[in-house]
Amino acid sequence: MPENPAPDKLQVLQVLDRLKMKLQEKGDTSQNEKLSLFYETLQSPLFNQILTLQQSIKQLKGQLSHIPSDCSTNFDFSRKGLLVFTDSAITNGNAQRPSNNLTVSGLFPWTPKSGNEDFNSVIQQMAQGRQIEYIDIERPSTGGLGFSVVALRSQNLGEVDIFVKEVQPGSIADRDQRLRENDQILAINHTPLDQNISHQQAIALLQQTTGSLHLVVAREPVHTKSRTSINLTDTTMPETVHWGHIEDVELINDGSGLGFGIVGGKSSGVVVRTIVPGGLADRDGRLQTGDHILKIGDTDVQGMTSEQVAQVLRNCGNSVRMLVARDPVGETSVTPPTPAALPVALPAVANRSPSTDSSLYETYGVELIKKDGQSLGIRIVGYIGTAHTGEASGIYVKSIIPGSAAYHNGQIQVNDKIVAVDGVNIQGFTNQDVVEVLRNAGQVVHLTLVRRKMCSSTSPLERSSDRGTVVEPSGTPARYVTGAVETETNLDGGDEETEERMDNLKNDNIQALEKLERVPDSPENELKSRWENLLGPDYEVMVATLDTQIADDAELQKYSKLLPIHTLRLGMEVDSFDGHHYISSIAPGGPVDALNLLQPEDELLEVNGVQLYGKSRREAVSFLKEVPPPFTLVCCRRLFDDEASVDEPRTTETLLPEMEADHNVDINTEEEEEEELALWSPEVKIVELVKDHKGLGFSILDYQDPLDPTRSVIVIRSLVANGVAEKGGELLPGDRLVSVNEYCLENTTLAEAVEVLKAVPPGIVHLGVCKPLVDNDKEEESHYILHSNNNEDETELSETIHDINSSLILEAPKGFRDEPYYKEELVDEPFLDLGKAFQSQQKEIDNSKEAWEMQEFLPPRLQEMGEEREMLVDEECDLYQDHFQSMDLYPSSHLQEAAPVSSVKELHFGTQWLHDSEPPELQEARSMMNMYSQETQQYGYSTENMIKENFGIDSLPSISSSEGNSQQGRFDDLENLNSLTKSSLDLGMMIPNDVQGPGMLVELPAVAQRREQEDLPLYQLPRTRVVSKASAYTGASSSRYTAGACELPEREEGEGEETPNFSHWGPPRIVEIFREPNVSLGISIVGGQTVIKRLKNGEELKGIFIKQVLEDSPAGKTNALKTGDKILEVSGVDLQNASHREAVEAIKNAGNPVVFVVQSLSSTPRVIPSVHNKANKIANNQDQNTEEKKEKRQGTPPPPMKLPPPYKAPSDDSDENEEEYAFTNKKIRQRYADLPGELHIIELEKDKNGLGLSLAGNKDRSRMSIFVVGINPEGPAATDGRMRIGDELLEINNQILYGRSHQNASAVIKTAPSKVKLVFIRNEDAVNQMAVAPFPVPSSSPSSLEDQSGTEPVSSEEDGSLEVGIKQLPENESSKLEDISQVAGQGMVAGQQKALDCPTDNAVSQMKPQKYSTKVSFSSQEIPLAPAPSYHSTDVDFTSYGGFQAPLSVDPATCPIVPGQEMIIEISKGRSGLGLSIVGGRDTPLDAIVIHEVYEEGAAARDGRLWAGDQILEVNGIDLRSASHEEAITALRQTPQKVRLVVYRDEAHYRDEENLEIFPVDLQKKAGRGLGLSIVGKRNGSGVFISDIVKGGAADLDRRLIQGDQILSVNGEDMRNASQETVATVLKCAQGLVQLEIGRLRAGSWTSSRKTSQNSQGSQHSTHSSFHPSLAPVITSLQNLVGTKRATDPSLKSSGMDMGPRTVEIIRELSDALGISIAGGKGSPLGDIPIFIAMIQASGVAARTQKLKVGDRIVSINGQPLDGLSHADVVNLLKNAYGRIILQVVADTNISAIATQLENMSTGYHLGSPTAEHHPEDTEEPLQMTAG
């Protein structure tokens, strides 16, 4: 039977919880039922009663032998199982009373009858001469006894004494008037509280008593009448203490704060902990450290916690009046308690004993008295030394907390060694053991310490460092101290231990600062020396003075107006952690940046004499906002990491053996808590790889260190198929890389880690890796550091890298280095980095040697650690410096000015084709490129194959020259949204950075004409003008190409890199350009059969693109072509897969006019229509291949080609294949042996639509997984039958996908050959991890339709039939569906090669006359309703005709925002941020991202198009329709220089008041507390809004207010035009009931706006009035349906979609419009389908309920069923319904789809129009006309 049933039961429950979690993670659900049953049994009341009864029986047996002869043995058991004794009579002083049943916790009572000498003697002994009182209190049937107790440990024998802490006024105990505060309870119900009774048992005795409570108490003689000043926390002095000094202090807050800090608790009182030097309290002079705060204003704060007192202070306003007390007096002088968790000391008895070692050491004893919940006030540190330096081992005093018991004692000094605690020798104990001994010690602690005789006393400065600086014990060799494993421990106890520790850490420096003596010197030197003394030698202190004149905030703001105002003032952002404030980023060009002194990760200590160190972030930021210039900043920078801090203990290499042998590595409690965050095992495993000419065969990324957000770690991202790492089998993706040979990678950036890996010579490489922790098993903690990161080591490392890679490293431009926001970099395709070696002297180049190194450039400093960045470190070529000796093409200044491109660039090399007449520089450049070509041949590849297979490039441009077929080498700097390049290498030549700016067009008259005869490609098509002689050897300068926008941005230095997820190509359009005599067309082109840019999903941009358009040229005059447009066709010649040369020739040979078919990038995915017109027809002389190419291309965007990682195609040799297959399968099974589940390896044959798989990611966005969520019944996967829904893909064709996104898998499937090898694992728990629930009907279901959810054959007259399975998906807010090509959110068949050839509304207007016949089938299997109504499978045939001329696209940079339509706009940020403030998000009732304010100094205000109230739907392709508030802020913060937004402006949202839903909120403001909310005012205009709601406050408990609500009035006083300060003052001064009038943006209107605007942009009407608008196929409706299902309905959030009926109540006045449009009914053209809501108007009363949705089926109106009613009947019902209208509705997926279709059809008609002549309910006629 358990000794302690309750704790044991709790422990078993915790073990069960952990066991269930582990089984769930492994996917094992077989034991769930048993575990649940076990869990329920343990928690059942019956089981608890059995436990209690067993315990009572055991206790009874133990007591029976001790029953006195005169004691009653009558006992019973209560219903709960407790032991109950019955006594006949008890003695209470002189009174005799009958006894009730007394429940005691199994402890036998001793009744104090006359003659019971045993009981009386025990009581007398416990009273120790004090007055004894016998008290009886009748316990009421309800409520408590009215007093509280506190348990304190006494000095003798470590007993726990119970004292009365407080008697509540008016309670039973108070009315009895016998029980008093400070009484010690000696016995409860005749049970003496001696050493046999624990504290918990005593409390149980009090709580479980029924009837009368019999107490025996001991009381000291009363010395004072003061009850409020009794000190309850010192058992050695229970006498009352009253204060020697009480003072009334009044402080007037000047805005800078009160200037003092408080700590404490209910038991010890709240005391002044610190006084800020120079602060208000310090200047006033009356308040002192240690003062007890008794009263604030009229509020008695005794018994409050420090947080409650702080709230009272905050509510006081500007004037704060306090009653404080100090210097308690009584029989004994007692130091008043300082902070709650700090000890209060009595004068210690000095027991200095004779020195044990008269020559070196003296031993002395110290007695410290600590109070309950408080510490001794010392920090200890443990040193691990060797045998011959015993003095370096042991526990030493590291620092002493000012005001603590140790501090007041005065005998303990820093560096004293603790040898014994209460007589227990602690030598040889670990830190943790010593901590436990000290914490478990009694009230009086006897310490025995040893001190070196010649040790001088340390200064307060040495005691005060909490930054990990260890003061070296005298006589201890330095090398052991710096390498010590140090665990700094604060010896706290009680509930406030953590708070106390943090308070102590924050305030050490404050205490030390008070004791510093000023040295006459310059202010800067004085500050510097003061902080240097304080921090020690490990930190460099910097003093910066900024005498700024802030003329314009816009000049300082570089990123976003969402950054706080202090960033504008100082030009830097600050991150705060536990009182430390670190510079996280520095704005380029800002005041701090101009100093060139500070850098990110420096800590900000002080500003203008006010110390920020130790302050909260709110205090620090508030101060930085207000502090006036000039600014004097004091910052520090850590110099070394030799010494471990408290939070990260580690040791240097020299001590590693001792640590491993001893296993006594000390960890404090904070570190144990942090271990829960660790992702990797602390054990370092050494992996040996042999580096060959291809590299190590893995790629890396950096990842935020979970234990330290300011650092990053290097993680293996993926392995190259058949690479060195994969063959070794010991490395896996996710392993943490900590060292390479002797180089430690701790605290290195990603770029530095890549350089280290590249610098390693071929041969054996030793990698230190940490494996990920599995199943939360925590191994034995051991700390390590492989290489000491001091300055000397860093210098050595950088010099080594420089020696090896001196020709690779190009200095990053300063602006780029300071950019704080980075995105993931796909760098599997390196670019050529031209380094310093180009400046060296000329020397002959040996063509046989390897000459080129391909690498990715990334800035050396990465400020933002939250994002992942990756680099490829394989496919290396050995580098020899002498290969570059002759490449002094241009002066060094050009090279240093040229900024490397931080995105992926392509590089091709060919054979030498230049003539001798060319300049030598060109020949040299060409020869170097040839070397690379020869080098790749040595590997067994042709240049083309190598680049094709390893870098994802399909082919190289083939050029016919006089020397035979060769490959042209060129290097086009195509820049995406964030590229920084100012240089280019074109036709194998360097271009100086100063050539008349980027994008300049250059003609080459002499060289160009000569090359024309050789059929060489030229970028400039016409012939005559010379633009610049300075660039006579250049083909073209830097081009700009945007992978996510229609127009390429002007890019500034300092902007970061962003790689879009996927491209969204707009529809093809036709542009005609008429030639002019002797004038060029004015365009330059770039591209060809080469991959230009790889996107995040693996898609590769490839083709012919417009590089630049001259303004005054024929092309420029059309205003139809832009940089970045893709040319699909020129005058009938298809350029989709043309080489660069073919494109040039096609343009040259085109007639007049030149007819281009081009595409521009769009920010949203669209289904692209076919394009057929006269310009598209195939020329008679085109061969059949060209015709086939053209048909393949019709209307489709370029398909993704290859994944980023290099992929080597399998060998053709069948024998080798068999052997390698077996070997590979074995390796695969070894690689994934640790993963839970069943591993499968299969091969499938793709068909024309791919594999027939739909993929999705993990529900947990922090984990990358690829799950199968749907299998097309007609696809290869379903035919094979081995794959199931829920399988997780690990590899495709030896390409490791484990740990990558599902977009990557899709891209691999699409580009894979016909035979696909899949490795996947099957886990039962996978369904719970998938981001998207499996499609409802599996392929094996007999009820499934032909294609599971309906197919959509789309036929056109000229294209063949194309069939694709579209799945209607259940709503899931966290879904991240596979997005194949241009179809968003529909889970299309993965591997589909063609985009669906369906027009959207927008695309219809841009098509030539053509005919579509679209059959739409709605799947009934999606609706789990029984019985299924007949309308579930309605077929609707739509036929549309259109004859529209394709218009030119609207320029998003200038187009106005049309209300009621989704608009795409572009805004260039310039030198400021966007300047937007937003509200809303899916996690708020607003459920949409809405602009709250447009700041006048921001880019949006300068642009002038965005208004407050506009809804933001997308930001640079990131969909915000279902984003949370934080996700939207993140997306807006990380925008590049040119921002592309999709916005929607509701037509009804022109008048502010109309947008608001106004409602009253009454909050009860309690005395001493606020309302629990923060407010903020608009910078421009009026209005005060709620910015934050405090947890636990009145507003939070009320649960009606949200962030973004506007306060319209307070207690009837209008606040619409009031300032923030006015509203704050009114709210602070309000008392009691506070009546607020709140305005909130209507959520219904935004929801409706989003729904009705899905396809509004660009929707066209037929030019023939007899035809209705063209209807988009239902795929667009399904897309809209998925997009419009929102989490507004709580049922959706919990279970996907609530199919049950809902009752909606609408209050409608006579003048109100109901605001809904209905469709359906008996006899409807849509069929006899039920009445459903077709539209909801934002301005109607129905929208205000926020409970109705488009597509809801109306079951009844005011109780009248609608079954069998016609449309007109229901319209009349609604028209005549006023007052209280009760609608019963039900959500229906099929109805929703039809409703959404009708929305699309009705665009442009009167639906919801406020100007409609008839009621909005009556909308059937136009709907019928449209649908007919």
UniProtKB/Swiss-Prot annotation:
The modification Phosphoserine is found at residues 459, 522, 645, 1211. Residues 1196-1208 have a biased composition (Pro residues). Residues 134-221, 248-328, 365-453, 553-639, 686-758, 1070-1162, 1241-1324, 1464-1547, 1560-1642, 1703-1789 form the PDZ domain. The modification Phosphothreonine is found at residue 1535. GO terms for biological process: establishment of apical/basal cell polarity; microtubule organizing center organization; positive regulation of epithelial cell migration; regulation of microtubule cytoskeleton organization; regulation of protein localization; tight junction assembly. It is a peripheral membrane protein. Gene3D superfamilies: 1.20.1440.360, 2.30.42.10. One of its GO terms (cellular component) is tight junction. The keyword Repeat applies. Keywords: Cell junction, Cell membrane, Cytoplasm, Membrane, Phosphoprotein, Repeat, Tight junction. Residues 1168-1220, 1333-1362, 1645-1669, 1805-1828 are annotated as: Disordered. It comes from the Eukaryota. It is found in: Cell junction, Tight junction; Apical cell membrane; Cytoplasm, Perinuclear region. Residues 1345-1354, 1645-1668 have a biased composition (Polar residues). Residues 5-65 form the L27 domain. Scaffolding protein that facilitates the localization of proteins to the cell membrane. Required for the correct formation of tight junctions and epithelial apico-basal polarity. Acts (via its L27 domain) as an apical connector and elongation factor for multistranded TJP1/ZO1 condensates that form a tight junction belt, thereby required for the formation of the tight junction-mediated cell barrier. Positively regulates epithelial cell microtubule elongation and cell migration, possibly via facilitating localization of PRKCI/aPKC and PAR3D/PAR3 at the leading edge of migrating cells. The L27 domain (also called Maguk recruitment domain) is required for interaction with PALS1 and CRB3, and PALS1 localization to tight junctions. The PDZ domain 6 mediates interaction with the C-terminus of TJP3 and is crucial for localization to the tight junctions. The PDZ domain 8 interacts with CLDN1 but is not required for proper localization. Forms a ternary complex with PALS1 and CRB1. Component of a complex whose core is composed of ARHGAP17, AMOT, PALS1, INADL/PATJ and PARD3/PAR3. Forms a heterotrimeric complex composed of MMP5, LIN7B and PATJ; the N-terminal L27 domain of PALS1 interacts with the L27 domain of PATJ and the C-terminal L27 domain of PALS1 interacts with the L27 domain of LIN7B. Component of a complex composed of CRB3, PALS1 and PATJ. As part of the Crumbs complex; interacts with WWP1, the interaction is enhanced by AMOTL2 and facilitates WWP1 localization to the plasma membrane. This is InaD-like protein. It comes from Canis lupus familiaris (Dog).
